[in-house]
Design a protein with these regions (language model features):
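Feature activates predominantly on carbohydrate-active enzymes
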Residues: 113-362, 368-372, 376-390, 431, ...
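Active-site neighborhood of glycoside hydrolase catalytic domains
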Residues: 338-344, 354-356, 360-456, 463-471
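Flexible, acidic glycine-rich loops studded with aromatic residues
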Residues: 442-458, 464-598
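Sec-dependent N-terminal signal peptides
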Residues: 8-18
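Flexible loop/turn segments at secondary-structure boundaries
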Residues: 62-63, 232-234, 260-266, 332-338, ...
Length: 598
């Protein structure tokens, strides 16, 4: 039975129009481009049609980003876009030209001008990669804009199942099958909200708004850290996490591979690191702060590590998405799993276990020649597997009580003329830095490496607020800003109704409000702020799905913090663009936090 139902139609129209707002003459790209202008013209900048082809210059037609763009256009429009080397009209030009100036290695330019080809130009393949990402957003939102405009002539007929004309029951509405008359210029069947089916007709052209974009990142370091020691994450998810980083035009993956609760990387010269160190017998139940003197455990063994072949595969996967993987092997503290495997490298001789509980542990490496030889062996095995110029040594939360109580260490300090244990950690860091330098690597450490004296070439990752980063840049060192106040994505996202987390509260607006360049430093010092990083520690994150939930869309907010001009940032405007950007999270099957979009 077919009949008009004005109440239901009104509800549907209001809901649809509220969701699909106009995007004409407005930026909807995320992160916000550095410069975007809209030429004054009534003509569309480019007509995307089934006759459109891709003209590729300076890059391979087999470039996976280009083949992915072709697939994306087909999914969005139904058009089978071909590739061509001919410079004809109705082309999308993808050009890599090292002679293009002012864009840098990661920048790109998009020109959409009437009567001209749509052009995406970049100095490098990396820049082209980011330009293609922005082009995808332009194409998708062109489709959204057109769908909205054609909704004006929507004539809906509803086949109901016993729906009263005055019904306000949402379940009644969802039971209705919606069909259309006069819904022109649409080329596919859409499923609104998963239940209402709308039949669409065919359209041959998508008119893309005229615009010129010149874009490049504000910071060279745009990173995310994932802890896989507390809870191991499978290879397939590590690749997906890399995809999520790339989706946000971020370029650094800090991989926290070792800690007290697990050693996650194969070292062939030291097989016990994975035979013993990758396994813990069980894990703390509930929150650490409530464990008290009688903690409860789940009785479930937890184990996992990455082979060197798997890591090579992951590093290659990341490189194709222009992401640099920075490994972290934590030392001299957070080394219980290491010392459980090889007790001779620990300060005390007593046997220890791979920790089942969170928090700061007593175990600390013995700063002797034997230990430094071991560390060099690690670096020799890892230096080529991880081609990054950076190597993170942790250095945080090293509890030095064992050093203070060891007669051997006290004698060592006298011989080295070291006055206190903080200075001994500085000595330890300096020795490791020399090993890394020998193999062409630069040392990164958490801000505790400042205590006892900062080594000349060390890069400080400032997590206990901003003071560590400020101290570093004033001393002539570089810094990466990642304070717990804004950048810890394992913190709660709301005051109530959230899954268990380590503590704190960092909502979407808090992340977006962060400014990586702190006040109180001059321009020269500010130039040594490399960028910022979000961190996902996994004490209370057992699954890939929860990693995604905790990370997104806070990672989306961070992407704009590290990419866009400070003066361009506006949270309300960001929230509007975020609603459109949600589509890209959906098609990548990301388990984001839906409440952040409300």
């Amino acid at each position: 039975m077919l009949r008009k139902n004005k109440n239901i139609l009104t509800f549907f129209l209001i809901f649809y129009i509220a969701t699909y707002t106009s995007v004409a003459q407005k930026n909807y790209i995320l992160p916000e481009p550095q410069n975007i202008t809209f030429p004054e013209t009534e003509k569309p900048g480019f007509r995307l049609s089934k006759k459109t082809s891709l003209n590729v210059t300076g890059s391979s037609l087999t470039n996976p980003q280009i083949t992915d763009l072709i697939k994306f256009i087909k999914n969005e429009t139904g058009f089978e876009v071909s590739t061509s080397k001919q410079n004809k009209k109705s082309n999308i030009e993808l050009v890599v030209d090292e002679n293009i100036h002012n864009l840098g290695d990661e920048g790109y330019k998009i020109s959409i001008i009437p009567n001209e080809n749509l052009k995406v130009h970049a100095t490098t393949e990396n820049g082209l990669f980011y330009g293609i990402q922005s082009l995808k957003q332009i194409i998708h939102f062109t489709k959204r804009k057109r769908d909205e405009e054609n909704f004006n002539d929507f004539d809906v007929e509803i086949e109901t199942k016993k729906i009263e004309s005055n019904s306000s029951n949402v379940n009644d509405f969802n039971a209705a099958n919606i069909t259309t008359k006069g819904y022109k210029n649409i080329n596919e069947t859409a499923h609104f909200y998963g239940k209402e089916e709308v039949q669409k007709k065919t359209l041959d052209i998508y008119n893309i708004t005229s615009m010129i974009i010149e874009d490049y990142p504000r910071f060279s370091y745009r990173g995310m850290m994932l802890d896989v020691s507390r809870h191991f994450m499978p290879v397939d998810f590590i690749k997906k996490f890399i995809d999520i980083i790339a989706l946000h035009k971020m370029n650094k993956f800090h991989w926290h591979l070792t800690d007290d609760q697990g050693w996650r990387i194969e070292i062939k010269k030291y097989p016990l690191l994975t035979e013993i160190g990758s396994y813990r017998s069980e894990t703390l139940k509930g929150h650490y702060r409530f464990a008290g003197n009688n903690p409860k455990y789940d009785g479930i063994p937890h184990q996992g590590f990455y082979t060197q072949d798997e890591i090579k595969e992951i590093v290659l996967y990341a490189s194709k998405r222009y992401i640099e993987i920075i490994p972290e092997v934590d030392m001299p503290g957070h080394t219980s799993a290491l010392i459980a495997s090889y007790p001779e490298f620990g300060t005390n001789s007593e046997k220890v276990e791979v920790k089942r509980i969170w928090g700061i542990q007593d175990e600390i490496l013995k700063p002797t020649e034997k230990t430094f030889s071991f560390i060099e062996d690690l670096i020799v095995e890892l230096k080529d597997i991880f081609p990054s110029e950076y190597f993170h040594i942790g250095g945080d939360e090293a509890k030095k009580t064992q050093w203070e109580n060891s007669s051997e260490i006290q004698e060592l300090m006298i011989n080295l003329e070291i006055e206190d244990v903080d200075s001994l950690q500085s000595y330890f860091t300096g020795r490791v830095e020399k090993i890394l330098s020998k193999y062409g690597k630069k040392l990164i450490g958490w801000d505790e490496i400042i205590e006892g004296g900062l080594n000349e070439n060390a890069i400080v990752m400032s997590w206990r607020g901003e003071e560590g980063g400020i101290t570093a840049v004033k001393a002539g060192n570089k810094a990466i800003m990642t304070p717990t106040s804004h950048m810890y994505f394992d913190y709660y996202q709301a005051k109530a109704g959230e899954p268990i987390a380590i503590g704190g509260l960092i909502d979407l607006e808090k992340v977006y409000s962060y400014e990586p360049v702190p006040s109180g430093i001059d321009l020269n010092e500010a130039s040594r702020i490399m960028g910022a990083q979000g961190n996902i520690w996994t004490e209370y994150i057992k699954t890939p799905e929860k990693v995604e939930y905790m990370g997104v869309p806070r990672m989306t907010a961070l992407s704009e913090v590290v990419w866009s001009k400070r003066k361009n940032r506006d949270f309300n405007e960001f929230k509007t663009r975020l609603k459109f950007y949600r589509y890209f999270l959906d098609i990548n099957k990301i388990n984001y936090r839906e409440k952040s979009f409300q």
